[in-house]
UniProtKB/Swiss-Prot annotation:
This is Potassium-transporting ATPase potassium-binding subunit. The lineage of its organism: Bacteria, Bacillati, Bacillota, Bacilli, Bacillales. InterPro entries: KdpA (IPR004623). GO terms for molecular function: P-type potassium transmembrane transporter activity; potassium ion binding. Its main location: membrane. Belongs to the KdpA family.
Length: 555
């Protein structure tokens, strides 16, 4: 029965992807019906804020994005620092320590949601609502806006206006869908209140303080926007965030909704729907391989315990919630790292070595399917690399969407693809070379190395999940992961927007018999191979020293 539920869940991922992709294309490209519904409200916003609806250059678009995001980081930083004297603080929680406030503000603006604090004890209701939830809408709206400009550039059209796209992302996508999802979560038992903690009497007569809050509205945008941060420290393992299997499936659907839809949006906007389908199917195959790998490993249990003759019918159950079980915990771990959300319904630090390797590889690749917007930019980056390599092998000038891929584009892509591993491996080396980093490790040996690399991989990929055995709420970890999150977020977005702007200016080369097609199964295979060879092999030495070595040791 459990496998039937898994198949149905995956079918739901597939079935909602195309309709959502079509809706996104209409929402941003202009639809009379949508303009009639949302247009008056958006024009009012533009009038109040002084936004002029004109086409920007890629530099203007990127500058607008960075300045708006930077302003939001500063505002939210001071909310965290001053929450102790601000209203809506029934638990009288004090202001955040400076480096933790720095880390948290960047974390949520970068759509990472790395949490070096416990949600219910670290933030007031005001900080949760005005700080955290506000950024949970603004962060994915930023990248959804940018990916639309990116696709327009690839299609040879004007990039558009960042503030217009940002507003449309909020009014036409995130606010309506999150609102409806929040109502469903309330119906499923997720609390939504501004009241403080309630005191309950336990069976043995003791008193217990049960924390609550505006959780349903928080969880809906947490998953839809690929944010992932928890209202509670236990994240989606907490019964108030994720009461049962229905809420669990809904959360996974929300996580996958926009990332899986964007290939279809892309196909429609560039006038090649088949190419969008090829990208979707290719990535789903990689996703499926990851799920099969982690599930097989978790169901086989811990090799060390198996050798003792301990029964493991349910697989490795350490760190997992009984109400979800091993299979759905494995699926959730695959989804949350494939879609770069970072929400967890099981503790990733307790996964088996190969089970923990899958989430780690998903984040290292950062492209299966990746987070809202940012992930799709990486998908196209790998697609262009695949075309470039194929062109070199047959001695032809590489072409993508009928436009020649030349030195300028490849230099930008080369720098972009190297920057991600540089952040991860460089900062991991720094942490391992100083006691400021190694003192946080709770496990010696191979697993300790994986803890460190996982933290920086999660930060660079804007995922936010962690091997929570790492004692990371220290100035060193707060500052270094904050820098990695910021650089990992904005560097690739800007460089790839420059690539799209460069391609926009090029004339379309007529298609000939020798043109390498990017909308067939051959390209899909080369695309997958490029992801594996260029992406995964970059990190292979580290994976050998971490989870693979740990697995062989346990064996």
């Amino acid at each position: 029965m459990i496998w039937v539920a898994v198949v149905i869940t995956m079918l739901l991922f597939i079935l909602v992807a195309k309709p959502t992709g079509i809706y996104l294309e209409k929402a941003f490209q202009g639809s009379k019906k949508l303009d009639k519904v949302f247009g008056p409200f958006e024009k009012l916003i533009f009038k109040i804020t002084g936004v002029k609806e004109y086409n920007q250059t890629w530099k203007q678009y990127a500058l607008s994005l960075v300045l708006l995001n930077g302003f939001m980081i500063v505002v939210v930083y001071f909310i965290f620092r001053l929450q102790g004297v601000l209203p809506l603080n029934p638990a009288h929680i004090e202001g955040m320590e400076p480096t933790l406030a720095f880390n948290t503000a960047i974390s949520f603006m970068a759509d990472t949601n790395l949490q070096h604090y416990s949600g219910e004890n670290g933030l007031s209701y005001l900080s949760q609502l005005i700080g955290i939830t506000f950024l949970m809408f603004a962060a994915p709206a930023t990248t959804l806006a940018l990916v639309m400009a990116f696709i327009r550039g690839l299609a040879g059209k004007e990039l558009g206006n960042f503030f217009v796209d940002f507003t449309r992302a909020l009014t036409r996508v995130f606010l309506p869908i999150a609102f409806m999802a929040a109502l469903v979560f309330v119906a499923l038992g997720v609390p939504q209140t501004l009241d403080g903690a309630v005191t309950a009497q336990t069976i043995d007569g003791a008193k217990q303080s049960i924390l609550r809050g505006p959780v349903a509205s928080f969880v809906s945008i947490k998953e839809l926007g690929n944010n992932g941060g928890g209202f509670f420290g236990a994240n989606s393992t907490h019964p108030f965030e994720n009461p049962g299997q229905m809420s669990n499936i809904l959360q996974m659907m929300l996580m996958m909704l926009l990332p899986t839809a964007l290939p279809f949006t892309y196909g429609r906007m560039v006038g090649n729907k088949k190419q969008g389908r090829i990208l979707f199917v290719s990535l789903f195959m990689v996703f499926l391989l990851g799920f099969i790998t982690i599930t097989t490993s978790e169901l086989n249990g811990n090799p060390a315990l198996n050798g003792m003759g301990i029964e493991h019918v349910q697989g490795s159950t350490e760190g997992k919630e009984v109400r979800f079980g091993t299979v759905f915990s494995s699926l959730y771990a695959t989804v949350t790292t494939a879609a770069e959300t970072g929400a967890v319904n099981t503790m990733h630090d307790t996964l088996t070595p190969i089970g923990g390797l899958v989430p780690l590889v998903n984040m290292m690749l950062n492209t299966v399917y990746g987070g809202v917007g940012a992930g799709f930019v990486n998908i196209i980056m790998y697609a262009i690399i695949a075309v470039f390599i194929s062109g070199l092998m047959v001695g032809r000038t590489p072409e993508f969407l009928g436009k020649k891929i030349e030195g300028k584009e490849m230099k930008l892509i080369a720098v972009t693809i190297l920057f991600h591993p540089l952040l991860i491996l460089g900062f991991s080396a720094l942490a391992l070379s100083t006691s400021l980093g190694t003192d946080a490790i709770s496990h010696s040996g191979f697993h300790g190395l994986t803890q460190v690399v996982y933290e920086y991989t999660s930060s660079a990929a804007n995922n936010g999940s962690g091997f929570e055995g790492l004692a990371d709420n220290t100035p060193f970890w707060n500052i270094t992961t904050g820098l990695v999150m910021f650089l990992g977020r904005y560097f690739s977005l800007i460089t790839m927007l420059a690539v799209a702007a460069s391609l926009k200016e090029k004339t379309v080369v007529p298609e000939t018999v020798g043109t390498f097609r990017t909308d067939n199964s051959l390209f899909g295979g080369i695309f997958i191979g490029t992801i594996v060879i260029v992406g995964a092999l970059t990190f292979f030495p580290m994976l050998v020293l971490g989870p693979i070595a740990e697995f062989l040791t346990l064996k």
